[in-house]
Amino acid sequence: MAESEVKLEDFFTRVLSIIGKTTEVEVAELLKKSGKTVAVAESLTGGLISSKLTSQPGSTEYFIGGIVSYHNRIKVMELGVPASVIAKESPVSKDVAVAMAEGIKRRYRTDIGLSATGVAGPTSTTPPKPIGLTYIALASNEGTSFKELHLTGTRGEIREKAAAAALGLLWLHLGGEEVLHKI
């Protein structure tokens, strides 16, 4: 299971390269086509997901905003993550990622909330959580989903892979899997 999760972000990049588009371009097209809006709550990615979503012209049609909730206090105050969940599970957990995605969706009144939390390294300040452990979550009117990833590489590589995986999750939610049937 962990082996397939490690390669998740590579999968999206490979599939989209086959059709000649980057993840950012494909996600932008799908968001515009659907008329849906998105907001992002980021911890370990520090704004990378928001940056990628706004890299395309016309991103104001679908990107409402984001919060970099690097500190636990911001997760609680701005996103409504229960302090008890952070205390019990640490900020790097499925439940925190889910609460972040649901919180940003609710706060910014968007169709989709996307989040990422994890340990980028080079050391872990949340033992016993290993470096590379990442949770991404997506909240929509249809419900909330999450993925646990075990990423490898340098701090920068882990952050980039986490951002790519989050965009991949958004791509799948928006119907990106239909692209697979055209290949």
Show the residue positions of the predicted features.
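Short alpha-helical segments enriched in small residues
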Residues: 2-183
